[in-house]
């Protein structure tokens, strides 16, 4: 009775989603649970009983950072592949040796990476970039998989520009392409990095187009919003629906 009294307080509220703990599935608890599902239209899911892995990818300026901020707000563990990669470059001696052999001189005498020099080695040079990526994937993918395995049940999000190329998409329940019109991406990159329109466009054209991500990912989140706040509201609705869908799918497999 207390559960239904509490639910009635939301009758005239704009709230779109309500979560309530379902009673024990025996005796009176079974009756209340059935009423929640049938009369009140609730869907039964086991909250955080399993791990849900989402992979986010897309080009620079599309809005991945804003989307990830929403996922963090929803309680997700976010694995930033770029951050893990740079941490490994600083700490993993085997990875450093492999990088030094392939790209002599990109590491300074103190062992730190000269990112500008490495960038010059691979920017707009397909063969060099492929060589670098092969090294990165060999070390990075097992580390991301290790961190995923160590994470508690719930939602995990992988943030990776090369999610598809590295094969990490195979570890995901859903892959999400974050896309956005080129003119908006240019504006965001110019404001974020304090660079000219010419250089912003160069960065975009050096990466794969939205059509590539759209065609290979299981779903798309388009960022055509004028402000980050507007996009985050859209992203929150999108991810809530997506997470609920994956949870229900996993639950149905058990039945």
Q: Model features per residue range: what roles?
A:
Residues 54-56:
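Hydrophobic anchor at the beta1->P-loop junction of P-loop NTPases
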Residues 65:
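Walker A/P-loop
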Residues 2, 7, 13, 143-144, ...:
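Small-molecule kinase domains that catalyze NTP-dependent phosphoryl transfer to phosphate-bearing small molecules
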Residues 142-150, 155-192:
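ATP-dependent NMP and nucleoside kinases share a basic, alpha-helical "lid"
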Residues 59:
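P-loop (Walker A) phosphate-binding loop of NTP-binding proteins
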Residues 62:
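ATP-binding Walker
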Residues 1-41:
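A C-terminal functional module that forms or caps the active site or interfaces directly
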Residues 83-153:
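ATP-dependent small-molecule kinase phosphotransfer cores
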């Amino acid at each position: 009775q207390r559960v239904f009294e509490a639910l009635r307080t939301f009758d005239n509220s704009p709230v779109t989603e309500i979560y309530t703990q379902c009673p024990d599935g025996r005796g009176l608890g079974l009756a209340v649970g059935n009423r929640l599902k049938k009369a009140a239209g609730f869907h039964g899911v086991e909250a955080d009983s399993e791990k849900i892995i989402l992979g986010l990818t897309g080009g620079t300026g599309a809005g991945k950072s804003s989307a990830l901020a929403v996922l963090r707000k929803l309680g997700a563990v976010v694995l930033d592949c770029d951050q893990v990669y740079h941490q490994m470059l600083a700490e993993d001696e085997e990875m450093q040796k492999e990088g030094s052999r392939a790209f002599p001189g990109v590491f300074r005498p103190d062992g730190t990476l000269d990112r500008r020099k490495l960038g010059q080695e691979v920017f707009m040079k397909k063969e060099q970039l492929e060589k670098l990526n092969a090294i990165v994937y060999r070390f990075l993918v097992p580390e991301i998989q290790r961190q995923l395995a160590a994470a508690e049940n719930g939602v995990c999000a992988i943030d990776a520009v090369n999610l598809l190329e590295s094969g990490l998409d195979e570890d995901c329940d859903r892959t999400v392409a974050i896309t956005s019109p080129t003119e908006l991406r240019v504006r965001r990159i110019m404001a974020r990095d304090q660079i000219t329109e010419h250089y912003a466009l160069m960065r975009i054209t050096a990466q794969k187009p939205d059509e590539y991500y759209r065609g290979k990912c299981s779903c798309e989140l388009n960022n055509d919003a004028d402000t980050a706040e507007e996009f985050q509201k859209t992203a929150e609705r999108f991810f809530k629906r997506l997470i609920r869908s994956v949870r229900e799918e996993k639950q149905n497999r058990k039945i």
